[in-house]
Structures are given as C-alpha cells and as structure tokens.
Design a protein with these regions (language model features):
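Bacterial N-terminal signal peptides that target proteins for export
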Residues: 1-10
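Compositionally biased, intrinsically disordered linkers/stalks adjacent to structured regions
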Residues: 148-170
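Second-shell loop/turn segments in exported
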Residues: 46-53, 141-149
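A short beta-turn/loop motif at secondary-structure boundaries
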Residues: 32-33, 78-80
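Surface-exposed short loop/turn segments
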Residues: 27, 69-74, 81-126, 130, ...
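Bacterial N-terminal signal peptides
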Residues: 9-21
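A structural "domain/chain start" motif
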Residues: 3, 19-61, 65, 72, ...
C-alpha cells in the first residue's frame, strides 16, 4: 500500500512538471517571451506596380490571422508589444526557361515584401528586411489565369517566412 502511495505521489509530481513546462514551450514553435502580450500590424501598403487591387488588404488579413492562430498574443490596432509594418515593394513577372523558339517555357511570378519588426521588450530582435517568394507557371497560362491561384500561395509563404523570422526565430 505504501509503494502505491509513493508511486502516485511521483506520478502527480511528474504530471505537474509536464503541465508547467507547457507554459514555457509552445507546440507551434514560437520563441516569444512570456512578457509579450499584444501584437500590432500597421497596414502594409502597395508600393509595387501591378498585382491584384486587393493584394495588400489580403496580405494584411493573412498576417493578422496567422499571428492570432499561432500565438497567444492579442491584436491591438496600434502600439503592440511586437509591431510589424512595411509594404509590398515588388510584383514581378519574368521568364524562367526558354524554348527552341526563344519563348518562355515557364514564367515566374515574384512578390517581395519589405518588413520592419519591432519588439518592445527586446530591441536586439528588431529588424528591417525584405522577404521574397515566387511561383512558376506554364507559358500557356496567362497571368490573369495564374494570379488567382499563385498570389494566395505566395502570400501564404511570405506570411510563414515573416512569422518564422519574428515569432519562431528561425
């Protein structure tokens, strides 16, 4: 009977230690300080020529939603503990590979976002940098046909890369 009581006590201590550890570590891979409670995102402007009219709005919403889903931080309109701002600075279409007739076999759509990140509790994490991602599509497909499929994929990857650089420190 005494062995069972000792075993139960050790089991209880083990469970409490594991549960307490969950407060420190995140299953989403974030490395954000426990001091951080809020985040703010100033609307990213569209500084690039071309692209869908609603691209900056779509990007802003995707970025906010990703932080809300993957952190415990609360959104504030301004002055969050961490703050992101920037603009979409490039929307480019370029040929990737040529065929025998000097035509592009594949085209590449590239989007670049300039980001300024501020962490009010740790200024060493502040940065300004560009994030770029692209998707290729066949030359037989027009940009008008490819845009509705490729732009959301590119924006999703840009959001993930920004999140990893700010919240996951990858």
């Amino acid at each position: 009977m005494k062995i069972k009581r000792v075993f139960n006590a050790f089991l209880l201590v083990f469970i409490l230690a594991v549960l307490n550890g969950c407060k420190i570590y995140s299953f989403t891979g974030t490395t954000l300080s426990a001091d951080l409670k809020t985040f703010s995102i100033q609307n990213f402007s569209m500084a690039a020529a071309g692209g869908p009219q609603n691209m900056s709005l779509t990007f802003n919403e995707k970025l906010k939603e990703y932080y809300q889903r993957n952190t415990s931080l609360k959104f504030k309109n301004t002055d969050g503990d961490i703050h992101l701002e920037g603009s979409i600075i490039a929307y480019e279409l370029s040929p990737v590979s040529a065929t025998a007739g000097d035509r592009a076999a594949m085209n590449r759509l590239t989007i670049t976002v300039e980001v300024k990140f501020v962490n009010k509790t740790n200024e060493q994490e502040d940065f300004e940098k560009e994030f770029t991602f692209y998707q290729d599509f066949p030359q037989e497909q027009s940009l008008t046909q490819a845009e509705p499929i490729l732009v959301p994929k590119i924006l999703d990857q840009l959001v993930l890369n920004i999140f990893n650089s700010t919240a996951a420190s990858w």
